[in-house]
């Protein structure tokens, strides 16, 4: 059976009821753009509206209920931006992603404050969004500007306790050691493709204040340092790319001035990542490197 929730607020003539529920009033003459039941709480649901089609307005309409639809809260915070889509983080219930007519916004506190998510994505209409839970990727489809993917790996650990620390190393996402193969005998017209991303993965960390020196040490399980990466020193969220290679070894001749540009790639397995800030080891996390699943299937 279906229940008309909007009828709790308006009579048949569209006038507000005097006995309407407390809290925010859901609009009855705006376009419903998304209904999103929470994956974390059975009584929580998000609803977004847009008045652009019916009233040519830019007002944001974002509502949430925590009691199964009995009462609602307005979490739009006065934004003037037609809303198209809303997604809930699969691992962190405090995080919501908002697709609007002017780009992507995110909240880390269930709608108390919304911020622009990325400067790299264009400020155009976001038609649809989807989260790939395993890879922690946010896929975004826009109107006229293409398809984008955002890495939201560290967001699942975004908590007040993390931001109060001087430095924090987020749990690394598994990295697949892809086998790069070159296709031959095909022209562009026969096989259209886009360049593959580089083999490796990003490591994320947080700095409460600007640091003098930041390094990330990659170690094997015996504690041997196999790679040393230099990180950004600015405060806030930082990321460093590791190409799955060990430190290059020196080569002989010319007093050792000629060195290998890249060391060998690591084998699949478990490694340790240590965040070093201003010479002090702050935190260590484990990192899993997996083999290309295609190669595993062949075995």
Regions found by a protein language model. Give the residues of each.
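Conserved structural position at the C-terminal beta-strand
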Residues: 275-277
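Short beta-strand elements
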Residues: 282-297
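Surface-exposed loop/edge segments in extracytoplasmic proteins
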Residues: 113-115, 222-229, 282
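Surface-exposed coil/turn segments at beta-strand junctions on protein surfaces, enriched
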Residues: 40, 196, 209, 233-235, ...
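Contiguous beta-strand segments within globular domains
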Residues: 179-214, 219, 239-241
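Beta-propeller blade termini and top-face loops
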Residues: 1-191, 198-201
């Amino acid at each position: 059976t279906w229940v008309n929730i909007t009828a709790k607020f308006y009579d048949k003539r569209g006038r507000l009821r005097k006995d309407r529920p407390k809290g925010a009033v859901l609009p009855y003459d705006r376009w419903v753009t998304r209904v999103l039941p929470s994956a974390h709480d059975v009584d929580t649901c998000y609803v977004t509206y847009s008045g652009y089609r019916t009233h040519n307005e830019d007002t944001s309409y974002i509502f949430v209920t925590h009691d199964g639809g009995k009462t609602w809260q307005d979490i739009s915070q006065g934004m003037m931006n037609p809303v198209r889509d809303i997604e809930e983080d699969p691992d962190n219930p405090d995080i919501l992603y908002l697709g609007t007519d002017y780009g992507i916004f995110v909240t880390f506190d269930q709608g108390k404050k919304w911020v622009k998510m990325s400067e790299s994505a264009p400020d155009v209409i976001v038609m649809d969004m989807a989260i790939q839970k395993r890879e922690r990727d946010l896929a975004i489809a826009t109107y006229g500007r293409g398809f984008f993917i955002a890495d939201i790996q560290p967001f699942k650990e975004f908590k007040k306790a993390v931001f109060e620390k001087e430095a924090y190393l987020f749990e690394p996402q598994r990295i697949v050691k892809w086998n790069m193969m070159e296709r031959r005998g095909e022209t562009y017209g026969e096989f259209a493709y886009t360049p593959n991303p580089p083999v490796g993965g990003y490591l994320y960390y947080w700095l409460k204040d600007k640091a003098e020196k930041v390094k990330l040490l990659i170690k094997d399980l015996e504690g041997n340092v196999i790679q040393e990466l230099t990180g950004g020193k600015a405060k806030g969220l930082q990321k460093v790319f590791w190409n799955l290679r060990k430190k290059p070894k020196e080569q002989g001749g010319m007093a050792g001035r000629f060195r290998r540009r890249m060391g060998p790639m690591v084998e699949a397995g478990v490694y340790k990542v240590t965040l070093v800030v201003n010479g002090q080891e702050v935190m260590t996390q484990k990192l899993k490197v997996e083999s290309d699943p295609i190669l595993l299937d062949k075995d």
